[in-house]
Amino acid sequence: MAGKLRVHELAKKLGVTSKELLATLKEQGEFVKTASSTVEPPVVKKMKQFYGVAQESKPTTPPSPLAQAGSVPDSTQRGPKPGAKPAAKPEAAPKPGTAAAKPSAKPSPAAAAKAAPAAKATPTPAEAAPKPGQAAAKPAAKPGQKPARAAGKPGPKPGPKPGARPQRVANNPFSSTTERPPRPRGGATPGDMPRPGGTRGGAGRGQAPRPGARPAQGQGRGQGTAKPGAARQGGGRRPSPAMMPATPSPGQMPAKSAAGFGGGRGRGGRPGGPGGPGGPGGPGPRGGRGGRRGGTAGAFGRPGGPPRRGRKSKRQKRNEYEAMQAPKVVGGVKLPSGNGEKIRLARGASLADFADKINADAAALVQALFNLGEMVTATQSVSDETLQLLGDEMDYKVEVVSPEDEDRELLESFDLQFGEDEGDDEDLAQRPPVVTVMGHVDHGKTRLLDTIRKENVGSGEAGGITQHIGAYQVSVNMEGVERPVTFLDTPGHEAFTAMRARGAKSTDIAILVVAADDGVMPQTVEAINHAKAAEVPVVVAVNKIDKPTAQPDKIRGQLTEYGLVPEEYGGDTMFVDISAKQGQNIDQLLEAVLLTADASLDLRANPDMDAQGIAIEAHLDRGRGPVATIIVQRGTLRVGDSIVVGDAYGRVRRMIDEHGNDVQEAGPSRPVQVLGLTSVSGAGDNLLVVDEDRTARQIADRRDARRRNALAARSRKRVSLEDLDEVLKETSTLNLILKGDNAGTVEALEDALLKIEVDDEVALNIIDRGVGAVTETNVHLAAASDAVIIGFNVRSEGKATEAANAEGVDIRYYSIIYKAIEEIEAALKGMLKPIYEEKEIGTAEIRQIFKASAVGLIAGCMVETGKVRRNAKVRLVRDGKVISEDATIDSLRREKDDVTEVSHGYECGMVLSYPNIEVGDRIEAYEMVEVPRD
């Protein structure tokens, strides 16, 4: 059984290039990568039908002589060329199918053969068969014809010398494998016409030389621009492979006659005048040089005469082209050259992903990076800098796709879009504004939110539910119309920054709370910068005006420096003086919010499309499972919809409003709690309704894989060969398991901990994170990985505490994020190797030396400064030179008693670990003291 065809083999059979066939296969949806890829038999059959239909559907044109130089055409597929030898005096218009009747169609073999010998008294150039060199002038000529070949160079060489042996035609006259057209009838036969070299000969018959034969060096190329009425000494020009009909069959061939001159094989002179009377290859009207003396080699397809460089095959051309594309040598490894090509890679991509983009070997990329000083594996997520470095070395422009672009491309692959309203303007309806309150911690932001809730919600319903959901709606009576306003109760502005960074347009207006008795604080300036970066209009609430020290005008002047100019000063920012504690001017603040929304924003959305929104908060409820707080931005969310929120997905089983009531649907700007997700989503993740659960699961899985790759690339430290020895040393690692009350808290805590920079000797590794209480599973994981569990606003449940005590797992509970960060930073510093510095404690001078057989030399010393201690390190200095750097005091005595130290002004005897001592030597005692790490 024959093996499968490869792409280049099939391309050769179909007569196309491998590049064209590869492009066609990829358009058909077949999985092929290179020209060496195998092709299944059904695909081979389909490609043969495809190219067969393509060839039959378009008119064929005569191939150029160079294109036919190396192959024998099949007469059943490639008939005689439209440039067959024209008669000197055409008799009439050619038969249908000839090039004269249909310039864009290829003549049949019989018609072309009949048109060649036809002759009449009156020549008709318009009806004559097309001549080479005129093909470019015909309007229906194909672009494949090359008229430059027909027009020869001026001053051609003379034809072959007289006496040349007759040459056999290129095609084997005894071959019966190809079908040949019948001999032309009617008119003067080619044998009756005078030939260029004399009488009709074997090479002068009206049969074409073999198209595949190659003319010898110097064989004539006739100048194919002879005029129709010009005198023709030979009765016509010698045919060329592009102009002559196919060789007739042996039964149709005329008998051979005497050989004539000028019987050059292959492409002899074209239909121009081959020479003067009786002169082989003499000058004719725009005639070309005649062919050289032909040989029998022409009958077998080999050139006669001096050798000529043959035409390169497709394989040779392809090899030369690939050789021109010299590979880049990066670190001693040959890699493909990009030539400035742009490559898009996702954040956290691996070298295997890079290699797949450029059709290279991932192992070669690993070796190249290793030689460049970077140590990574093929499947390891690498940083953006490493990808840029490798791309620059190979001349590729690496573009790391941002998370927003990557998510948009992911949704487009599922034919989904996020962030645009569907339909026309008449489909859009008004929606309530979404307002976020920002400001300094002590400026009354929380009190303002509580005041608004108490005025619009009953005191019995304003408890934990509203605080827990983090968002609520209030109604404002403006000009007799009740208008709802949605408030986000997200503590602090860190979550606001994260949402802006993700591009979520969840906030329409920001209320900036500034205390009238305190002024503009650093967090106030930070909040202003957040609002400006998000291009959100700001309404300033000057709070605490009921205090005696309040200075509202001073606040207005300070905020003017930051671009918030009050309306009374000629600006466009609304300022409202309020007292959140007294409930003063709260209605005016809400009206100012609505006026700003009407003047600055187009608050419209399509309520009839599939819902899209944003998750502002998510947590794990013990009885209800993962719960996400959603604000619908456009469309309507209904119970039963299949949704995907970040890397979490599920079906909406239940929706709860800010009052704890169940709702069946939520329109634009409506905050609700959604139950039914499979996992806890992240704060700021986008919500999208899809058609089915399978699509939601696929989107969530791909987002989760992307997030893990990006996290791995961000947390991985670049290891180079220079610091390999340091890396291989024992490194202290603090493993942590984070548990929090909601996803936003866990995310903020994780980001803050990963930003702690202590030293390269210690590392922080967060092995697990989650929402909810500390479970027994967390304890077992911490015990196996020697980790510390950090619980933020949560406690342990069940037997988790007992398991932690039994296995020695440390669980730390925190309710303030800054305290958790400080303690973990201190723990990391405590894991550092201590740094010691030298501290001098005293000096002594050797006054006398005693010898003892038991201990050796004893130095009698006087303590000059400080004190000396037993076992202390000493430095022995003689004449200003250090004799010993790290000697120790092995024995210390005062009189006859062993002592631990001797103070300044006292004599003592000591035995040193360094025996080479002399009188007058100076002893400097010191100790190594640990220095606290910053």
UniProtKB/Swiss-Prot annotation:
- Chain residue ranges for the region called G3: 489-492
Q: Where is the signal peptide?
A: none
Query: Can you tell me which family this protein belongs to?
Result: Belongs to the TRAFAC class translation factor GTPase superfamily. Classic translation factor GTPase family. IF-2 subfamily.
Residue ranges of the region described as G4:
543-546
Q: Does the keyword Manganese apply?
A: no
Highest taxon in the source lineage: Bacteria
Composition bias (Basic residues) maps to 308-317
Gene3D superfamilies reported in the protein's UniProt record: 1.10.10.2480, P-loop containing nucleotide triphosphate hydrolases, Translation factors, Translation initiation factor IF- 2, domain 3
Query: Which parts of the sequence bind GTP?
Result: 439-446, 489-493, 543-546
Transmembrane residue ranges: none
User: Can you name a GO cellular component term?
Assistant: cytosol
Region of interest (G2), residue spans:
464-468
Q: Compositionally biased, Low complexity: which spans?
A: 80-154, 185-197, 206-231, 238-250
Which region ranges are annotated with the description Disordered?
Answer: 54-323
Q: What keyword terms does UniProt attach to this protein?
A: Cytoplasm, GTP-binding, Initiation factor, Nucleotide-binding, Protein biosynthesis
Instruction: List GO molecular-function terms, semicolon-separated.
Output: GTP binding; GTPase activity; translation initiation factor activity
Subcellular location field: Cytoplasm
CDD domains, alphabetized: IF2_eIF5B, IF2_mtIF2_II, mtIF2_IVc
What name does UniProt use for this protein?
Translation initiation factor IF-2
Gly residues bias: start-end ranges: 260-303
Q: Does the keyword DNA-binding apply?
A: no
Its gene name is infB
Annotated function = One of the essential components for the initiation of protein synthesis. Protects formylmethionyl-tRNA from spontaneous hydrolysis and promotes its binding to the 30S ribosomal subunits. Also involved in the hydrolysis of GTP during the formation of the 70S ribosomal complex.
Outline the segment boundaries, as ranges, of region: G5: 579-581
| Residue ranges of every copy of the tr-type G domain listed in the record | 430-602
